[in-house]
Curated annotation (Swiss-Prot):
It comes from Ovis aries (Sheep). The keyword Ribosomal protein does not apply. GO terms for biological process: cell differentiation; spermatocyte division. GO terms for cellular component: cytosol. This is Protein TOPAZ1. The lineage of its organism: Eukaryota, Metazoa, Chordata, Craniata, Vertebrata. Important for normal spermatogenesis and male fertility. Specifically required for progression to the post-meiotic stages of spermatocyte development. Seems to be necessary for normal expression levels of a number of testis-expressed gene transcripts, although its role in this process is unclear.
Length: 1599
């Protein structure tokens, strides 16, 4: 290894990545993890990624400190140093060995799970991938050469190193013994690491002096920790496993050394020497601390895929550190240290895991210390915390310990997690863990031991999520960052064997996994794409690291970060272990089959390289975040608020995701797909080596982290295929894998990846068996409290077992109930939907992990975005027992995860703030950040919802609440692609647009009115609000909407009510009961705003709702403690009382009582009491007004006394008090009877008039009141019409004429209640006519628009006849008064003229019209005469020709030539004059002698126009135009004088023309008729001037 590493020093990027991978792989040992991390940084100091990551993390940290400008300069300097720092090949080799050793242990079990999970190792493309920039520092692009000479191979998933032939032995050995072995082996590596660190520190120190001067405090912390690491490393032995530890420490120390070198090279050396004096554990712990600090500040150490593996074994130990973190919260450092020690001894396959615990503890303490330096979080010294943690780890059971740290598990407790479980060191590294999860996923695919792999993946997921949240800084250090969250988690799970660890990890991952699952596609189809372009990844990682660093710094300020990280780590682990829950429940470890995979080492190398590259999260950052989390936990315990701020409301999972360095770096739980940038990274590592089994679903965060770290992407192939954006950024799309994992097909890349794996025997050796865990052990799984959300992470893991998935569903269905914001996003299609089985299994894992964590219930409330549950419709209701168990675990996880979530949210918010400036890191990161940002926006967590397992199975569990940063879109809406298809299919089929059964007029939008979803057109041409007169439509719509009682429909009804009655007043169709029902429904659906709006509008339109509605509003406000709504409610109440609402004393007392409950002010209560006193003054002394029976008795009394004024007052009182409109109508009918029947004629007054006068004085009269009063008047009118009491009837009509338009109303009683409108109008007109009021009669007719018989107002033939007689009578009377216009109006509206339905012969009206025409002509009313003539001609009414001729003559003499010519032409068509056509064109005009001069002139005009062509032609000047004055038969009998007068009229006609015409007398014909000739010149002149209009009038306008 050393030779190889040294040989590859030239390849800075690859060697750095590889070294980092090796370091992470060696992170199995707690100390080695630290050493490895440091070594990675040292070795990777040679590799550019290491330097970059540390640089970026430190810069992120600086950003958090507000020194963003320095970050860029430091980055540049560190980059320069990176090139210089390519020096520690030995360290690389050591790290690789250590990583391989640790990986061997995990790989045993991972290989077991490999077949099922198709763990895709990093393909050789990983080698090509230099370090990911996001994880720059620690990211080791593990090249094949990095493998040990002993054929140590990197597990693709965890990045752990396969122990060479002795791995199986090490597995068999007691975890303690393994740990012991590891410790000595770590010593030489630590020495090497120390040297490397020294070198790196020197390089960094040289160029970073200015930077150090600015950030002395932070670097000092880093330096102290680095020195400790160096001393520890020097003190550690040279065993292979310990080499792994050393390598891990080396990585962490390299990072630390980098910063420390930046701070003081000598100082690091001195501190390292001093630290060397301390014991191994203490050194390891310190190394961890320092490495964590370094990571935290540096953020440059990118965890390679190996780092997650190393971190996983370290996680095993870190479980104890995790316990220690809890202890730190409890301030029981010593006990926690003992537990760590025990945990270290307990891990089955990974001796390195124990050192990682110590390391993790040390890292925690160092992190805390550094945090305390930067942000005073803990006063406890890092060394003391480390020692205590180490002791606890030794003596305490590695059982899941509540995040709060209230309890530590005794070493003798039953359930323990195998050492194989990666010490949750990897978990702390959120981004690392994400990558690590991917690596673990790969390993899981590679190994059959799903439990182990899942646990590791879960740990990784949890770590990644926690890292994401705690700090993107952790992204830099693969193993170190991993160590921290894992340590927290491992303390809880380490108690038992691998299973227990897995369960813990599952629980941890459960929280994160839930969130991660939303982001990640199901692990079943997860593919790990390691592209040769690691530089891109490294750049992305570096960005993320910077983001993470800043976030980590912020997280350090927020103590809650630790808890959040823990939970996040736990959730991620749960994600990785879908089947682990089953194993834990069933305890059937024997059922695990260890699949044989070929070329496992190569894949592992690739994966490790990827994981190391991506897992850039530094353990220091994790420790900082954890220490912050501890403080935050305490704060959280004190403060029940789940979310301190909007960003803090982010779920743990979101915060855990380290991949997203920027504010967008946080993945939303709902996003099932990793952003395209992640895919890009994953695919950039061209070999898509990582494919997770169906059982392995990495939470979205975990997947995202995996993609960053391992360049892997976990998702269902189908889902991936559906997501073009997945491939948009990817160089190569995911390829289907032929091999099946857990019965699922893996992508072809998996087979390709297999080529790089080592021997099958080694795979067996690397695997570790799980030990049965007591399923119902409350100590292990914790006690869940009902009502709490099971997963803060909220995304169920997808397991291959549908039963498990159902369990998760049951547990997560509670989350499902929480409202999920489903906002359409471009990425919606891009998110693959996890398989139901894998989701279930992951849910179980997350449940178990969550149960182990046991945090305060205060944090149980998860922000809305965090509480979503994913279940696939394909899941079957099987395995209820498992589901129940998982749900229990889930509940437990809920509790613990909730606390972690809150803390993690806080951390995330801090990280988000610090990294908000780095929004452009990666597209995928941005998507994840967008998803995470949404929870940040939620200020208040939602209460947990409980669902039964059956309900959970049936419910379609949404993805994690679609939390998104501004401008971001949720990546996933539906959990299952089939569900998506069904949804689309149903939408296309219009399933959701099913008509509601309303009959809507065509002019209205049927979608808006008649469907639940409403109109979706951007611009609809149809009306969305009823128009005036369609109040009945409004009422029908309201009734239908109220009956359906859908929230959207009720809101629409409220809007429709507001829009309609703002424009139009209530009419006869207004139903007060509908209003009350609408208000009641709105109130039931908590639509208080709409209720207030409608109530205020009702006050304006004087339609008061029922009193019970008002009381319900007060009750609602008091129950919900809506103090802010009290002022508006009091104001509305006062208006209602002023408007006439009557309240009893009891009502006022009740309202006051409610106001006291809501803590209303004295002024508000006083206002209510004042209204009470005012109302008393307005009320009658008797209470009968509210009693209808008493009111009726009062009415009888009024009737007997004839006190109609008092009756009006009673009417008003009843109107205000009566709640039901129907009752009020019946009351009005009774009033009408009183006013009409049994009235004594001798009484001069009209009861209705006095009654109407009193009622009309009320200013509060609405349109409905007027309508009812009018209907009472109609009944009275009928009554007097029957009695022929025309005067009284007219008084009634006069009163209605003043106040009400009654022509469209009907009576309330008797036949008038069903009488047609024509009949009512006829009776009213007749009363006016009989009483001598023609104006009144015409007013009634005009108000009714002269309607007789229409489809809307049908009537009988008798009514039509009555109308005819009535109009004729009125016409004669009006004509007698020379009211021609009114007469003509009446005649025009006779039956038969309005529509075709009136089959009346209009010719019978000839006498009336001719009489009118004659009268108009006689009176010289030419305009009216002309109108009457035109109407008669148009309606074919026979007209008297004499009247028409007189009209034409009068019009001509009055110079109204246009009308005269028109009527003359009409007269010609009617035959009034002899035809002219026969002689017109013969140049001969025959004019009857009886015509007037006007008629003669008009005849001459026609003659000239007809012969215009011949007259105007030049050759016809000699032709003669003759006019013959024809004698008629009548004229023959007359005297000569008459004919002579005709001759004079002819001459006059020629003169009055314009221009004048000249005629000559030529001769007398045989009939003694005078013959005249028309002079050609005058005719030609006339044509020139009048030809244009002449042609139009006489030739073309023939009728």
């Amino acid at each position: 290894m050393v030779a190889q590493a040294s040989g590859k020093e030239v390849e800075s990027d690859k060697s750095a990545k590889e070294k980092r991978k090796v370091t992470e792989a060696s992170s199995d040992d707690p100390q080695p993890g630290i050493d490895l991390v440091r070594k990675e940084s040292l070795t990777s100091s040679e590799s550019f990624p290491t330097v970059e990551c540390s640089e970026f993390q430190s810069m992120a940290f600086l950003q958090s400190l507000g020194k963003e400008r320095l970050v860029e300069g430091i980055k540049r300097r560190i980059r320069i140093k990176k090139f210089k720092s390519l020096e520690s090949p030995a360290l690389k080799m050591t790290e690789n060995k250590a990583t391989q050793n640790s990986k061997v242990e995990f790989q045993d079990e991972l290989y077991k799970n490999t077949l099922k999970y198709s763990c895709n190792s990093l393909s050789p493309g990983v080698e090509n991938n230099s370090t990911l920039k996001l994880h720059d520092c620690s990211c080791l692009s593990h090249s094949k050469d990095c493998n040990d000479e002993n054929n140590l191979a990197y597990k693709p998933d965890g990045g752990c190193m396969h122990v060479p032939e002795n791995s199986s032995k090490s597995k068999k050995e007691n975890p303690r013994s393994l740990i012991d072995k590891t410790d000595p082996s770590n010593i030489p590596q630590l020495l090497q690491t120390e040297e490397n660190l020294m070198r790196v520190s020197q390089l960094l120190l040289e160029e970073n002096d200015s930077y150090l001067s600015k950030n002395n405090g932070m670097f000092s912390c880093l330096q102290s920790e680095k020195n400790k690491h160096s001393i520890e490393e020097s003190s550690i032995g040279r065993k292979s496993r310990k080499r792994m530890k050393v390598s891990e420490k080396g990585n962490g120390m390299v990072i630390e050394m980098k910063f420390s070198n930046m701070c003081n090279k000598s100082e690091l050396m001195l501190q390292g020497n001093q630290t060397g004096a301390e014991g191994k554990e203490t050194e390891t712990l310190e190394a961890k601390k320092s490495s964590l600090k370094v990571l935290r500040k540096v953020n440059n150490n990118t965890l390679s895929p190996m780092d997650p593996l190393l971190s996983l074994p370290e996680t095993g130990k870190k479980t104890s550190p995790e316990h220690y973190a809890n202890a730190v919260f409890q301030k029981a450092v010593e006990q926690l240290s003992k537990e760590e020690t025990k945990n270290v001894s307990q891990p089955l396959g990974c001796t390195s895991m124990d050192p990682p615990e110590d390391y993790f503890k040390s890292m925690k303490n160092s992190l805390v210390k550094s945090l305390s330096d930067c942000f005073p979080i803990e006063k406890r010294s890092s060394r003391e915390g480390l020692k205590n943690e180490a002791e606890e780890s030794k003596y305490s059971c590695h059982r899941t310990i509540p995040m709060t740290g209230k309890r530590t598990w005794p070493c003798y407790s039953c359930a323990r997690i195998s050492a194989q479980c990666w010490k949750k060191a990897s978990l702390p590294q959120s981004s690392r863990q994400d990558d690590f999860l991917r690596h673990q996923m790969n390993q899981t695919h590679l190994s059959d031991s799903k439990l182990m792999l899942q646990s590791s993946v879960t740990e990784t997921n949890s770590a990644s999520s926690s890292i994401e949240k705690l700090d993107s800084n952790l992204n830099c250090l693969p193993s170190v960052s991993t160590v921290e969250p894992t340590s927290v988690v491992i303390k809880e799970p380490i108690v038992n064997d691998d299973e227990k660890m897995k369960s813990e990890e599952l629980s941890r991952s459960a929280s994160e996994v839930v969130s991660n699952i939303t982001e990640d596609t199901p692990l079943t189809n997860v593919t790990h794409n390691s592209t040769g372009s690691k530089k891109k990844d490294r750049g992305n990682l570096t960005k993320l690291n910077l983001m993470v660093a800043s976030q980590d710094g912020q997280e350090a300020s927020n103590s809650t970060g630790k808890t959040v990280h823990r939970k996040a780590c736990i959730t991620k682990q749960a994600l990785v272990v879908p089947d682990l829950v089953k194993i834990l429940n069933t305890g059937r470890l024997t059922n695990f089959k260890i699949p044989l995979l070929k070329n496992k080492t190569e894949k592992r190398k690739e994966i490790n390289a990827k994981s190391s590259e991506r897992e850039v999260y530094s353990p220091l950052e994790l420790l900082d975040s954890l220490s912050g989390a501890e403080v935050r936990q305490s704060r959280t315990k004190e403060n029940t608020v789940t979310v301190t701020s909007g960003p803090q409301s982010l779920s743990i999972q979101h915060s855990v995701i380290p991949v997203q360095a920027s504010s967008d770096s946080f993945c939303s739980k709902n996003s099932c797909i990793i952003a395209p940038s992640f895919l890009k990274q994953g695919n950039n590592n061209k070999p898509s080596s990582h494919i997770s089994a169906s059982g392995h679903i990495i939470s979205n965060k975990a997947a995202g982290s995996l993609t960053v770290e391992n360049n892997t992407f976990s998702c269902d192939p189908g889902c991936i295929e559906k997501n073009p954006t997945f491939y948009s950024n990817e160089q190569e799309p995911f390829k289907a894998v032929s091999s099946e994992v857990s019965g699922r097909k893996m992508s072809k890349n998996f087979s390709e990846i297999k080529v790089g794996f080592p021997d099958i025997l080694k795979a067996y050796e690397d695997d570790v068996l799980l030990i049965d865990v007591i399923q119902d052990d409350p100590d292990l799984f914790g006690v869940s409290s009902e009502g709490e959300l099971s997963f803060p992470s909220e995304v169920p893991l997808i397991s291959q077992e549908p039963n498990v998935a159902e369990e998760h569903q049951s547990a997560d269905s509670k989350h499902m109930e929480l409202p999920e914001k489903k906002e359409p996003s471009d990425h919606l299609r891009e998110l693959p939907v996890p398989d139901p089985g894998s989701v279930k299994s992951e849910i179980c894992a997350s449940l178990s992990a969550a149960s182990e964590i046991k945090h305060d219930s205060k944090d149980a409330n998860i922000s809305l975005g965090e509480v979503t549950h994913e279940t696939s419709s394909n899941e079957k209701p099987g395995g209820l027992s498992e589901q129940t168990k998982s749900s229990d675990l889930d509940e437990k996880c809920r509790f613990s995860d909730k606390v972690a979530i809150r803390e993690e949210k806080e951390t995330i918010s801090e990280v988000f703030r610090s990294d908000s400036k780095n929004t452009e890191i990666m597209v995928g990161e941005c998507h994840l950040a967008a998803l995470v940002s949404k929870p940040l926006c939620l200020p208040v967590p939602l209460p947990p919802l409980n669902l039964s397992t059956h309900q959970e199975d049936t419910l379609l569990n949404p993805w994690m609440n679609d939390f998104r940063l501004p401008g971001k879109h949720s990546l996933l809406k539906l959990q299952n692609p089939e569900i998506c298809e069904i949804f689309k299919r149903e939408k296309n089929l219009g399933v959701f647009q099913k008509p509601l059964g309303l009959i809507i007029p065509h002019r209205y939008c049927k979608f808006h009115f008649n469907t639940i979803r409403g109109c979706e057109r951007s611009q609809c041409k149809f009306a969305h609000v009823p128009e005036q007169g369609d109040e009945k439509v409004c009422m029908d719509v309201f009734k239908k909407y109220i009956s359906i009682s859908e929230l959207c429909l009720l809101q629409r009804a409220a809007n429709m009510f507001m829009e309609y009655y703002r424009k139009f007043l209530p009419g006869i169709h207004f139903d007060l009961q509908v209003l009350n029902d609408l208000l009641n429904s709105l109130l039931k659906h908590c639509l208080l705003k709409e209720v207030f709006q409608i109530m205020n509008l009702c006050i304006m339109i004087k339609m008061l709702p029922a009193l019970k509605i008002l009381l319900k509003i007060f009750e609602y406000v008091a129950t919900m403690k809506l103090r802010n709504a009290v002022p508006a409610l009091i104001d509305m109440f006062c208006k209602l009382v002023e408007a006439g609402m009557v309240l009893d004393l009891e009502h006022f007392n009740y309202i006051v009582k409610l106001l006291y409950q809501v803590q209303a002010s004295k002024q508000e209560i006083t206002a209510v009491l004042e209204m009470k006193s005012r109302l008393r003054m307005r009320q009658f002394k008797k209470n009968w007004k509210c009693d209808l029976e008493a009111a009726l008795n009062e009415i009888e009394h009024c009737k007997e006394k004839g006190d109609w004024t008092k009756l009006g007052n009673v009417y008003l009182n009843i109107k205000m008090s009566c709640e039901k409109f129907a009752d009020f109508q019946r009351f009005c009918a009774y009033i009408a009877e009183i006013l009409t029947k049994d009235c004594k004629e001798e009484r001069p007054g009209v009861p209705f008039c006095e009654f109407a006068e009193t009622v009309s004085k009320d200013l509060q009269n609405s349109e409905v009141d007027k309508t009812l009063l009018g209907r009472i008047g109609i009944s009275a009118m009928y009554f007097y019409h029957k009695l022929l009491q025309w005067s009284k009837g007219r008084k009634v009509l006069d009163k209605l004429y003043e106040k009400i338009h009654c022509t469209s109303l009907k009576g309330l009683i008797g036949p008038e209640k069903l009488a047609p409108r024509c009949q009512i109008v006829n009776i009213a007109a007749e009363i006016f006519l009989k009483s001598g009021s023609l104006d009144g009669a015409i007013w009634v007719l005009r108000e009714s628009e002269w309607i007789i018989n229409t489809p809307v107002w049908p009537c009988d033939r008798l009514d039509v006849l009555n109308r005819h007689n009535l109009l004729c009578t009125i016409a004669h009377e009006i004509l007698a008064k020379s009211l021609y216009r009114q007469t003509f109006e009446v005649l025009q509206n006779l039956p038969g003229f309005q529509n075709s339905q009136e089959t009346v012969e209009v010719s019978q009206y000839s006498l009336l019209f001719n009489k009118l025409l004659d009268a108009c002509i006689e009176s010289n009313s030419l305009g009216m005469s002309s109108s009457v003539a035109e109407f008669m001609i148009s309606k074919s009414i026979p007209i008297d020709f004499s009247f028409l001729r007189r009209l034409i003559t009068s019009l001509g003499r009055s110079c109204l030539w246009l009308k005269a010519r028109a009527h003359y032409k009409s007269a010609l068509s009617l035959g009034c004059y002899p035809p002219l056509e026969g002689n017109l064109y013969r140049k001969l005009l025959l004019i009857p002698s009886y015509l007037s001069e006007i008629e003669m002139l008009l005849a001459i005009e026609i003659f000239l126009v007809s012969n215009a062509s011949s007259i105007q032609s030049p050759g016809t000047s000699t032709q003669m135009l003759q006019i013959v004055l024809k004698r008629s038969e009548e004229n023959k009998s007359r005297s000569k004088d008459d004919y002579q007068a005709a001759v004079e009229r002819l001459i006059m006609a020629a003169r009055i023309s314009d221009p004048k015409l000249f005629i000559k007398h030529m001769t007398v014909n045989v009939n003694k008729e005078q013959v005249y000739s028309l002079e050609h010149c005058s005719a030609l002149k006339w044509l020139k001037e009048n030809m244009k209009w002449g042609v139009k009038v006489w030739l073309f306008n023939n009728r």
